[in-house]
Amino acid sequence: MEIKDGFIAINKEKGFTSHDCVKQIRKLLGIKKVGHTGTLDPDVTGTLPIAIGSATRFIQYLPQGKTYIGQIQLGIRTKTDDMQGEILNKKDWPVLSHKQLDKYLNNFRGIIQQVPPIVSSVHVNGERAYKKAFKNEEFELKPKEVEIEELVLNKWDQINGILEIKVSCSSGTYIRSIARDLGGSLDSEGCLLKLKRISACGFHEKNSIKISDLSDNNDKNAPFIIPTISALDHISTLVLANQEEINFWQTGRIIKFDANNFVKSRSFDYKKPIKIIDPNKILLGIGFINEEKTILHPKLVLNAK
């Protein structure tokens, strides 16, 4: 069986880079066009959605939220803000009840300004920050706005200074920064001890598979491939009702918008992208409606003519 496109949720194991996973998927499935939805550090485990074939064009339209389970070690500051980096300072942590520690976490809930770790993929004057850090160059990273939708204190070990948190956040959030800044707010230090991503871009750990469990036989791999249209289930849907409209679409021409063709099972927001399908529920691409709500503009066209 030939696999042409779709998504596969990989349960990334420790030690692998995201690019390592992409290379292995290319080799196993025999497909050149493969990409991931966002980098996971080598020591971070968990959900890594990977796009195959034409699905790579739809990555930007996936849900952007991500959820992590992480352990933070108080009392230690490192160069990388996790336990892999050089230790820069050690400082005792205060005696805190679970409730008291949870109150400190309020500083990291909602929309916040966050400074990324210096060892990160953020660009600084055209170069990745981690490259500058490894060359011991001095530079400053600007804070950026991120949203912490949920931050739950699961466990608190006062004796060892280790807390476990569950974090649901926007794309671009660094859990290492939360660890570092929490330690600072406690007049101590902090770094990330362990991290696992349990969901990302609408894909969940429970539906993921380890690369080592995949086969070089695509008949066996096929059940793990998620159709692109299923990955876009959160997006409103518009049906092109006839062949003339489909021909217009596939040649990149605008189409008169007919609200009666809207699939009513999804709420409709004219400012957001819409997935376009034919009467047989075949995905045709992504479009937008103009402000007057009269014209459908093609944005991403599959099988363009």
UniProtKB/Swiss-Prot annotation:
Q: What does this protein do?
A: Responsible for synthesis of pseudouridine from uracil-55 in the psi GC loop of transfer RNAs.
Biological process terms from the Gene Ontology for this record are: mRNA pseudouridine synthesis; tRNA pseudouridine synthesis
Q: Which family does it belong to?
A: Belongs to the pseudouridine synthase TruB family. Type 1 subfamily.
GO MF, one term, reads: RNA binding
Q: Which organism is it from?
A: Prochlorococcus marinus subsp. pastoris (strain CCMP1986 / NIES-2087 / MED4)
The name on file for this protein is tRNA pseudouridine synthase B
Q: Does the keyword Repeat apply?
A: no
Q: Where is the signal peptide?
A: none
Provide the active-site residues from the annotation: 41
Q: Which reaction does it catalyse?
A: uridine(55) in tRNA = pseudouridine(55) in tRNA
The UniProt record lists the keyword Isomerase: yes
Q: Which domain of life is it from?
A: Bacteria
Keywords tagged on the record: Isomerase, tRNA processing
Q: Which HAMAP family match?
A: TruB_bact
The EC number on file is: 5.4.99.25
